[in-house]
């Protein structure tokens, strides 16, 4: 933790560090709210997602300003990527010293920026602080824990996240319950998620299950990929499966023959608007994505999460999410398609009301005085 010149003043900027698609969705309402307050801002894109379909299209869809800098780090092992991120961010923060660094989520760009800023004596604010899966085999869990300990401001999306931070010794005056900025973006674009238009443009079936899988536990082990492919082929006997294929898993799923089933449709990665339209029009969603768990909660679409745990339990207690294993995926999905799962529809998590960006901007503005 550190102190520095007031962030957002004419002499210093609030630096937003983004590097992966979920970061862009979370940053958009914060950048917008601070812009309305006249804050001096700088958007630093690390280039962790370097494909246009994974990155630039999201800036266009969300109306984010063109990044002031793109570090172009790209992919690599966790150590290589994090090291490259830190080198690039240290250069950026030294040449353009920010008054505050705002980081989002739990990707390698998040923890790299927090480490560099803290070592340079620049305050850090973490949006989406306090989420815990309690599974240290997940790289994201390590990133979350380290980032929260380095942060001067911890912006929590749900009450249980505040409890986690308290249990880890984070001072209450650093913690703010603000709601979920990802939901700000979702609610602000509801009239742009046209599932019918997407269905017509991509020639999708009337009834389908949307799938998206990218986590290492699901896509890095060839045996796991083979089993998941078999299960998804079984799902396709119940309903067509439409799956935008993340670059991380494309080669593995191609080798396993996922697209060989006549009722499995594989797509290139989609932009934000198209992806949420695909989700909105689905009869159910199969995923391992944290953000999709949150979006389906608001959209009221049954969500089956192929993970043993989730750092977003509010999507289970308040939303439409259910944890499943590869072994029980098909049976659980069959129930979901028949409406035999208690979806707890309409029970929106606290403060998921489209005003999180304003709350974050308000705290940042007060903090700088």
Predicted features along the sequence, with ranges:
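Nucleotide-activated sugar donor-binding and catalytic core shared by glycosyltransferases
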Residues: 2-238, 249-369
């Amino acid at each position: 933790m550190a102190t520095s010149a007031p962030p957002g003043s004419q002499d210093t900027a609030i630096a937003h560090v983004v590097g992966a698609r979920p970061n862009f969705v979370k940053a958009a309402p914060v950048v917008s709210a601070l812009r309305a307050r006249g804050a001096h801002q700088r958007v630093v894109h690390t280039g962790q997602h370097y494909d246009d379909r994974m990155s630039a299209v999201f800036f266009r869809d969300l109306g984010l300003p063109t990044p002031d800098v793109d570090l172009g780090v790209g992919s690599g092992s966790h150590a290589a990527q994090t090291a490259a991120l830190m080198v690039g961010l240290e250069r950026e923060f030294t040449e353009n010293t920010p008054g505050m660094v705002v980081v989002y989520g739990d990707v390698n760009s998040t923890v790299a920026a927090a480490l560099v800023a803290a070592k340079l004596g620049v305050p850090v604010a973490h949006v989406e602080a306090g989420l815990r899966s309690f599974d240290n085999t997940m790289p994201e869990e390590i990133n979350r824990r380290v980032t929260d300990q380095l942060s001067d401001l911890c912006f929590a999306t749900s009450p249980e996240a505040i409890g986690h931070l308290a249990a880890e010794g984070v001072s209450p005056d650093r913690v703010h319950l603000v709601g979920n900025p990802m939901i700000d973006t979702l609610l602000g674009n509801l009239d742009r998620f046209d599932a019918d238009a997407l269905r017509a443009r991509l020639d999708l079936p009337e009834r389908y299950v949307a799938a998206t899988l990218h986590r290492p536990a699901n896509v890095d082990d060839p045996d796991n990929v083979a089993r998941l492919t078999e299960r998804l082929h079984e799902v396709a006997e119940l309903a067509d499966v439409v799956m935008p294929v993340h670059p991380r898993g494309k080669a593995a799923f191609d080798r396993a023959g996922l697209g060989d089933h006549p009722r499995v449709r594989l797509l290139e990665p989609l932009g934000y608007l198209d992806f949420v339209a695909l989700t909105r029009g689905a009869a159910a969603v199969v995923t391992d994505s944290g953000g999709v768990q949150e979006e389906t909660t608001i959209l009221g679409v049954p969500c089956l999460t192929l993970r043993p745990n989730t750092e977003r339990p509010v999507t289970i207690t308040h939303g439409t999410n259910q944890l499943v294993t590869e072994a029980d995926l098909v049976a659980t999905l069959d129930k979901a398609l028949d409406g035999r799962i208690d979806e707890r529809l309409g029970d929106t998590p606290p403060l998921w009301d489209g005003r999180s960006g304003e709350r974050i901007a308000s705290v940042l503005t007060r903090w700088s005085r």
